[in-house]
C-alpha cells in the first residue's frame, strides 16, 4: 500500500449531515449524486452513510460543475476519463498531484 492509501482524506468517517453542512448541498442532493454513481459512501453496519474528505472535495467539484450547467452524465464521463488516465499514466498522476499541492499552498498562503 502507498502512503496515499492511508491518507486521512480517504477515511470514510463523516456523516451525511456534516457533509451537507460542509458543502452547502442538501442531504437529498448528496443522495442523488450517489444514485447517479458520482460518489460512493461507505455504509456502516447500521446502514449509515460515511464519507471521506476526498468525497467532500469531489461533491464540491460536482456542485461547481452543476452550477456551470454541466449535466451529471457528463460529469461522470469526465470523472471516469480522469480516473482512467491516472491508472494508465504515472506521469499524469504525478502532474495532477503536483497541481493539487500547488493550488493548496497558493490558497493557504493568501
Swiss-Prot record:
Protein name: HTH-type transcriptional regulator TnrA
Alphabetized Pfam families for the sequence: MerR_1
Task of the protein: Transcription regulator that actives the transcription of genes required for nitrogen assimilation such as nrgAB (ammonium transport), nasABCDEF (nitrate/nitrite assimilation), ureABC (urea degradation) and gabP (GABA transport), during nitrogen limitation. Also represses glnRA and gltAB in the absence of ammonium. On the contrary of the MerR members, which require longer DNA sites for high-affinity binding, TnrA requires a DNA sequence of 17 nucleotides as minimal binding site.
Presence of the UniProt keyword Cell membrane in the record: yes
Result after altering residue 99 to R: Causes constitutive expression of TnrA. Feedback-inhibited GlnA has a greatly reduced ability to block the DNA binding
Location, primary (coarse class): membrane
Record's keyword terms, sorted: Activator, Cell membrane, DNA-binding, Membrane, Repressor, Transcription, Transcription regulation
MF annotations from Gene Ontology: core promoter sequence-specific DNA binding; DNA-binding transcription factor activity
Effect of inactivating the gene: TnrA mutant is impaired in its ability to utilize allantoin, gamma-aminobutyrate, isoleucine, nitrate, urea and valine as nitrogen sources. During nitrogen-limited growth, transcription of the nrgAB, nasB, gabP, and ure genes is significantly reduced in the tnrA mutant. In contrast, the level of glnRA expression is 4-fold higher in the tnrA mutant than in wild-type cells during nitrogen restriction.
Additional facts recorded: The amino acid sequences of the N-terminal DNA binding domains of TnrA and GlnR are highly similar, and both proteins bind to DNA sequences with a common consensus sequence. In contrast, the C-terminal signal transduction domains of TnrA and GlnR have no homology.
Top-level taxon: Bacteria
Compartments where located: Cell membrane
PROSITE patterns: HTH_MERR_2 (PS50937)
GO cellular component: plasma membrane
Complex and partners: Homodimer. Under conditions of nitrogen excess, TnrA forms a stable complex with feedback-inhibited GlnA. Interacts with GlnK-AmtB complex.
Amino acid at each position: 500500500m502507498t502512503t496515499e492509501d492511508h491518507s486521512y482524506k480517504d477515511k470514510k468517517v463523516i456523516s451525511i449531515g456534516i457533509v451537507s453542512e460542509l458543502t452547502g448541498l442538501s442531504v437529498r442532493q448528496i443522495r442523488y449524486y450517489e444514485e447517479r454513481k458520482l460518489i460512493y459512501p461507505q455504509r456502516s453496519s447500521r446502514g449509515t452513510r460515511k464519507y471521506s474528505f476526498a468525497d467532500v472535495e469531489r461533491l464540491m467539484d460536482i456542485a461547481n460543475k452543476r452550477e456551470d450547467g454541466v449535466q451529471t452524465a457528463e460529469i461522470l464521463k469526465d470523472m471516469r476519463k480522469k480516473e482512467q488516465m491516472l491508472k494508465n499514466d504515472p506521469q499524469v498522476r504525478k502532474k495532477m498531484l503536483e497541481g493539487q499541492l500547488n493550488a493548496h499552498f497558493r490558497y493557504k498562503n493568501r
